[in-house]
């Protein structure tokens, strides 16, 4: 299912790692809070407030992971869908980041049907400092499953003309 590498494998199968994906060191600390989460037919948007609660100035890389409902197709425990970085925040200062991504970025590929499929159900949007350090979450519901059919890249889309061999 997954190669034995990367946060998707390690998180899905509960393997411990020395440094989780997205891990970074800082001389300060940050607090996260979801301000707003919304999803329309095409786009997802999450507003997150990041506040420097430490004693020195610093920047923070904010990561957004999505946990999809079990729609019958294999999925990792969570997948990175968006990220952003704050400006240099002084102690006590905060900034709101707006993270956006396409709704179909949350879909799974169905090899049998050659289609991207967005399962119906609850999607957990996890705001994190790394793949192992989730700070806050929001939940959005997909009320109707969606499929986006694609074609086989190796299959000719129109019949290929057959040319007779030429003798030289």
Q: Which residues fall in each region the model found?
A:
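Hydrophobic beta-strand core residues of beta-sandwich domains
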Residues: 38-39, 87-91, 118
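Short, hydrophobic/aromatic beta-strand segments
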Residues: 57-64, 76, 109-112, 136
């Amino acid at each position: 299912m997954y190669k034995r590498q990367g946060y998707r494998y390690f998180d899905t199968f509960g393997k411990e790692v020395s440094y989780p994906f997205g891990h970074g060191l800082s001389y300060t600390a940050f607090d996260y809070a979801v301000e707003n989460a919304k999803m329309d037919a095409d786009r997802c948007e999450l507003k997150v407030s990041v506040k420097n609660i430490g004693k020195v100035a610093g920047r923070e890389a904010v990561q957004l992971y999505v946990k999809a409902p079990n729609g019958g197709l294999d999925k990792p425990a969570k997948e990175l869908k968006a990220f952003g970085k704050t400006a240099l925040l002084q102690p006590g200062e905060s900034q709101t980041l707006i993270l956006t991504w396409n709704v179909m970025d949350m879909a799974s590929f169905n090899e049998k049907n050659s289609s991207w499929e967005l399962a119906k159900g609850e999607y957990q949007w996890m705001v994190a400092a790394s793949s192992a350090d989730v700070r806050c979450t929001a939940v959005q519901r997909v009320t109707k499953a969606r499929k986006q059919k694609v074609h086989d890249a190796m299959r000719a889309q129109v019949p290929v003309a057959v040319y007779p061999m030429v003798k030289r």
